Structures are given as C-alpha cells and as structure tokens.
Amino acid sequence: MMFQDSVAFEDVAVTFTQEEWALLDPSQKNLCRDVMQETFRNLASIGKKWKPQNIYVEYENLRRNLRIVGERLFESKEGHQHGEILTQVPDDMLKKTTTGVKSCESSVYGEVGSAHSSLNRHIRDDTGHKAYEYQEYGQKPYKCKYCKKPFNCLSSVQTHERAHSGRKLYVCEECGKTFISHSNLQRHRIMHRGDGPYKCKFCGKALMFLSLYLIHKRTHTGEKPYQCKQCGKAFSHSSSLRIHERTHTGEKPYKCNECGKAFHSSTCLHAHKRTHTGEKPYECKQCGKAFSSSHSFQIHERTHTGEKPYECKECGKAFKCPSSVRRHERTHSRKKPYECKHCGKVLSYLTSFQNHLGMHTGEISHKCKICGKAFYSPSSLQTHEKTHTGEKPYKCNQCGKAFNSSSSFRYHERTHTGEKPYECKQCGKAFRSASLLQTHGRTHTGEKPYACKECGKPFSNFSFFQIHERMHREEKPYECKGYGKTFSLPSLFHRHERTHTGGKTYECKQCGRSFNCSSSFRYHGRTHTGEKPYECKQCGKAFRSASQLQIHGRTHTGEKPYECKQCGKAFGSASHLQMHGRTHTGEKPYECKQCGKSFGCASRLQMHGRTHTGEKPYKCKQCGKAFGCPSNLRRHGRTHTGEKPYKCNQCGKVFRCSSQLQVHGRAHCIDTP
C-alpha cells in the first residue's frame, strides 16, 4: 500500500539544474554525490520502517543532510564562489509541506517516493555512474501520449500532458492567470512580490531561484551554451534549443482545441488561445495598455523606462529586446539563417521567412475580425488592426509624431538622426532600413522575386507587388472619414489626410519648402542637387525617382497597363489614369487657397501656385533663365540643343513642343476640303 502522507524526495531536496551543476568542479560533484547517497540510504530505511510518528524526525534528518551540502561547499576554497550562491538559499525554501501524495513508482524503493531529481540526472551525465548504484534508477517508463517525451514519474507526465490539452488547474488569486502545475503558479506569484534572494549585479533584478538567476545573467553576458547541431545557432537555455530544433523537424506537438492550429511550444499555444478569448492579463500600470503575453508586456515597459539591456557586441548599440539586437547583429554578419525549401531564397528574419513561405503556399491564416482582410504573419495583422483603432503607441520625442508599429517608429527616428546603417557593398550607397537596402540590391542583380499570379508580371519590391495585386482586385482598404475617398496603400491614405490637416513635417533647408511625405521631400531635394540616380538601360536617360524610370521604360516597350473603364483609353502610369478619370467625372479636388481655382491634379495646383508667389525653381544651366514648371524648362532647353522631337505625320515637319505640333495639325484640318 502507498502511504497517503509520505514525503517524496523532491519535497525536501535542493535540486540542481543543468546550468547550476555545470558550475561545480569534479571534487564538488563527488562531495554532492556522497552526501546524496547518504540521503537515499535514509529514504530506503524509512521505506522499510515507515511509521507516521517518525515522519517529522526523518524529515529533519533529511533537511540537515541537505544543508550540509551547502555548508561544505561554502567551506571549500575551490568552491567558495559557488558555495556562496548555494548558501543563499533561504531556510524557508526547504520547509515544504509534507502533506499530499507526491510519490512515484520505483522498483528499487517500492512504497517510498522515488527521487525525481535534476541533481541525480546531472550526476549520471557528468560522472557516468548509475545513480547511487541502483541500476533501475534513471529509467523513464512514463511517456507523453502526445509527443512521446519520457518521464520517470507519473505525476510529471500528467503535469506535462496538461500543456498539450490546455488544462490549467492552478489559478493565481491576484491576477486570475492559470497554470498547469503548482510549481509554475508559485514561480508566477514571485512576479507579484517582486523579490528574491538572487540579485543580478548588472541590473539589480531579484530572482527567487538560482536556475532563473543563471539564465537571466546570460542576457547580460551573452553566454549561449546550447548549440543547434543542424544550423549552429546558439541559445542561452536548453528549452529554447528544444523549441528551435522543432523548426528543423517541423514538429508541432501543441495543438489548439478550438481551431486545430499546431505550435512548436506551449507558450505559443497559450498566447494563441488568447486570440480566441481576447484575454490580455498583463496590464501596464503607467498607460493602462494590456498584453496577452508577459514577454510583450516586459518589452512595452521599457518604452516608459527607456531601458535597453541588450547591447550589440560589435558596435555597442543598445536595444529593448533580444530579437532586435539579433536582427541588428545580422547587419554586421550578413547572416541569413532561414532558407526557403521552395525556391532556395535565404532570409535574415523569421517573420520575413514566414511571409515569404505564405507567398508560395498561398496560406493567409491571420484574418482581421473587423474588415476580413488576411495576412501572412500575425505581426502584419496586429499592425493592420491599429489602422481601425487609430492606436499609435510609438511616439517620437523630437517631433511628437506617433506610429502604429515599432519598425515605422525606428525608421522615422533616423530621419532626425540621419543614420543610415545599411550600406550597399557594390556601390556604397547607404539606407535607413534593411528592406530598402535589399530592394536596392535588386537594381544591381535585376532580380524580381515577386510575380503576379494573375498576369505574371514580376516585381523587385514586395510593396509594389502588393499595390499591383490590388489593381486586379480593385481593393482600396484605406478610407478617408472626412470625404469617403479610398486608397490602396496606407502611405497614400496618410498623404491624403495631410491635405485636410495641412500637416507638412518635411522642410527643405535650401529653399524652405515643406512637404507632407518623405518621398516627395527626397524627390524635391534632387531638384537642388541635380541628382538623377535612376538611369534607363536602353537610352541612357536618367531620372530622379524609380517610379519615373519605370513609367519612362514603358515608352520603349509600349506597355500601357492602366485602362480607363469608361472609354477604354490606356495609360503608362496609375497617376495618368487617375488624372484622366477626372475628365469623365469633372472632379477637381485641388483648390488654390488664394484665388479659388480648382485643378484635377496636385502638380497643376503646385505650378499654378507659382503664378501667385512668382517662384521659379527650375533654372537653365546654360543661360540662367528660370521657370515655374519643369516642362517649360525642358521646352526652353531645346532652343539651346535644337532638338525637335514632335513630328507631323502628314508633312514631316518637326517641332520643339507638342502644343506647336497641335497648332500645326489644325492647319492641315482647315486645308482638308
């Protein structure tokens, strides 16, 4: 018979994790083994002569024996540092309750609770001994029915299986969070207390357990002792390595009961379940924002404190979260650990890799509950959802501008600092973001990895590919609340919004002119510098922007992909189609504030505005004459070059500008009877 009030070994043992055990030298490990052998002999004797009245006497003997381990290590000169850590374990950590059945079956100890101890496992690993000369110890007869992981204790396998089923029996009284085991609940309660005997010398954080302290310390030291045999990637603790290994094997043992989706780890499953329940148990005390995971909550807190504990070893730059420092470090190493099995493409980031995979499989599993729009990755969905709520949690301290994603915020910060950390190895040009560098790189290679499934057209830029796809779907998800106008891109939507607010955040230092979007500002800057970085390979003509080069390219190919549905007329660019559409509708949305005159396009309004201001920013390099619009400068330039590109089909006469050809054409019409 099994004693109902028996004391299992794990109730009284001071156990070592793999990390803690690694700190001990061989003599200290032998000392631990000798003391723990004595402990087992005590347990065995209790098993033979078990009497309820002797429980507490024997329990005190066990406690005394276990404490000797710490004391002897502390006295050892060699183990002084490690002994100091061990003797920090407070007395109350050993005073665990003696009630409740916590025994496991063992062919050696019979009715006595077996020693399910991390220490014993590490003694076997490091010394090669069978645990305390008992051959049967170390067997793991209990296997998880979901993932087949072996355990040497029935209660352990039952606790583990709850991670798969999602059953959580232990509830935190303070915040209502639930856990699969009592030990996990106890560890969680410490978060509410905010105390612990192990204080980090780097950041002052106090931790309750030595194992947690050692793992936490690695976030500062950068130590990563667990390495993946397949790809060489290293991790700070073994559980992270196990989860990572599943990305190679494809194993996803944790399944959602509600939608059937499977995950690599139980934490991912629990975080996913909250997308069904809407639960966000972690609330920020400063701003009230709630989070579904403690990790996201901790990173958010740093936006208030300004703490950046993760530092790049190469350049010293600090970051709020480990994923950001890893992403940054790849800019130094150019490492791309994620390889696509479909096309062989290698990517630097897991999110980019997941997005890329979705393009091959067509799987778009993350759907917006408000508008039904689907996304390849959860991060893209989260960013999109903020367009509905209007939430912009990332605020620039310099100009006050707010953003709905941290990446947009980081990119914006560089407009103030001028930082361009991503440099092209071929031409030396620098960029503010890795994605811009990647897109630029394709101008050298000619690579166009994004192909439209409907018409087969390839693109070098993913955002251009998305814009093009919306042209087929006629999708315009971004709507102006004031006028009801819809847009296919958030950038176009935000640019339009500024026409209402009058917000112009980008000012030219040379002429004082301000712009409401960074691309217009950059394009304008080239009118001063004369820079034209985009050159046509067919005729050598250069342009200030990639879009201009693309539109020009169609004059060679004759391609006109934008067709008017009303009259069938086709155009080489979307803007020209849009402008043409207004000839049917009569719409003139751009109004001059000085005289009230309206125009069908922004550029016409801009040129008209110069008739009021007298501004003539386009200057002829040969004679110094200035003009209000670029077309007039081009026309004037032909008086110097003698170029006459407009030819009459009837008589062959040539002209400098299209208007002269049109006037001449009318003369033929009059002559015709």
From Swiss-Prot:
Keywords: DNA-binding, Metal-binding, Nucleus, Repeat, Transcription, Transcription regulation, Zinc, Zinc-finger. One of its GO terms (cellular component) is nucleus. One of its GO terms (biological process) is regulation of transcription by RNA polymerase II. A zinc finger (C2H2-type) spans 142-164, 170-192, 198-220, 226-248, 254-276, 282-304, 310-332, 338-360, 366-388, 394-416, 422-444, 450-472, 478-500, 506-528, 534-556, 562-584, 590-612, 618-640, 646-668. Residues 7-85 form the KRAB domain. One of its GO terms (molecular function) is RNA polymerase II transcription regulatory region sequence-specific DNA binding. It is found in: Nucleus. It comes from the Eukaryota. The keyword Ribosomal protein does not apply. CDD domains: KRAB_A-box. May be involved in transcriptional regulation. Belongs to the krueppel C2H2-type zinc-finger protein family. This is Zinc finger protein 433. It comes from Homo sapiens (Human).
